[in-house]
Amino acid sequence: MRNKSQSFISSKLIFICCSILVLFILFLKRASFSSNSTATIRDEYHQKSKCPSTPQQCTKLPTSLSDALVHYVTSEITPQQTFDEVSVSKRVLDKKSPCNFLVFGLGHDSLMWASLNHGGRTLFLEEDEAWIETVTKKFPNLESYHVVYDTKVKDSNKLMELKRTEDCKAVSDPRDSKCALSLKGFPADVYETQWDVIMVDAPTGYHDEAPGRMSAIYTAGLLARNRYDGGETDVFVHDINRPVEDEFSVAFLCGGYMKEQQGRLRHFNIPSHRASFGTPFCPADISRRF
């Protein structure tokens, strides 16, 4: 009886020990699986959250462009130039920007010009000091200078006669020019900057007492010809439906340098004359017209 009882107890003890061993093994496997799963999840998380090895480009819209979008979307004012006219200048700026862009006139198109030349320098020359204050107060990032003109539209016929004089055919810094059409009162950096694009859309020129664009057109051409880096300057003249803009642009920017005319806008491409001494003021086909 005792032997049978002892045998039963031994069997029961063995069973309990085996059960504990099995449970312990299962526990170890479960713990190992849990640890591996946690490590895998953690690794995946770190892999996803890990910063890229190379910095990503910033895709945020620049303030100057967002200002332009908001301004033109909400504005009811018609720009000075039509879509087709603006497209001519835009094609040039698409190729040259960021570049040095000089604009005669500060107007409702100014924010657009600065935006099309994003990353470059766009400088506006304006005759109306009060208007400069109004515009730059709203758009302080626009760079502009107040300038003074001493000509009048009523004198344009007399000034046109200067095209025959040697003083007005000579290429030099406008400040040193002996031509009466040369504008000498601008800030120094206007003359010292190599302008890639020039837009003549000012000063006022729609009545006889207005300063007119005679000197602006001549000086734009002189700045282009006097480039010391040997580059070419694209010059645009707006309102060529008026006699002054029409006649002075052909006479002093030269029909031979004319590239395109769209609506009231005329486009010239003028090379530096300093790169080759003896270059005539206008090419041989000066009579070419669009």
UniProtKB/Swiss-Prot annotation:
An example Gene Ontology molecular-function term: glucuronoxylan 4-O-methyltransferase activity
Localization of this protein: Golgi apparatus membrane
Tissue: Expressed in roots, rosette leaves and stems.
Broad class of enzyme this protein falls into: transferase
UniProt xrefs under InterPro entries: IRX15/GXM/AGM (IPR006514)
Biological process, per Gene Ontology: methylation; xylan biosynthetic process; xylan metabolic process
The protein's Enzyme Commission number: 2.1.1.112
Keywords: Golgi apparatus, Membrane, Methyltransferase, S-adenosyl-L-methionine, Transferase, Transmembrane, Transmembrane helix
Main location: Golgi
Membrane topology, record value: Single-pass membrane protein
Disulphide connectivity of cysteines: none
Catalytic activity entry: glucuronoxylan D-glucuronate + n S-adenosyl-L-methionine = glucuronoxylan 4-O-methyl-D-glucuronate + n S-adenosyl-L-homocysteine + n H(+)
Cellular component terms per the entry's GO annotation: Golgi apparatus; Golgi membrane
Pfam families: IRX15_IRX15L_GXM
Membrane-spanning intervals of the chain: 8-28
Superkingdom of the organism of origin: Eukaryota
Loss of function: phenotype: No visible phenotype; due to the redundancy with GXM1 and GXM3. Gxm2 and gxm3 double mutants show reduced stem mechanical strength.
Function, as annotated: Methyltransferase catalyzing 4-O-methylation of glucuronic acid side chains on xylan.
Family statement: Belongs to the methyltransferase superfamily.
Name of the molecule in the record: Glucuronoxylan 4-O-methyltransferase 2
Protein's organism: Arabidopsis thaliana (Mouse-ear cress)
Gene name linked to the record: GXM2
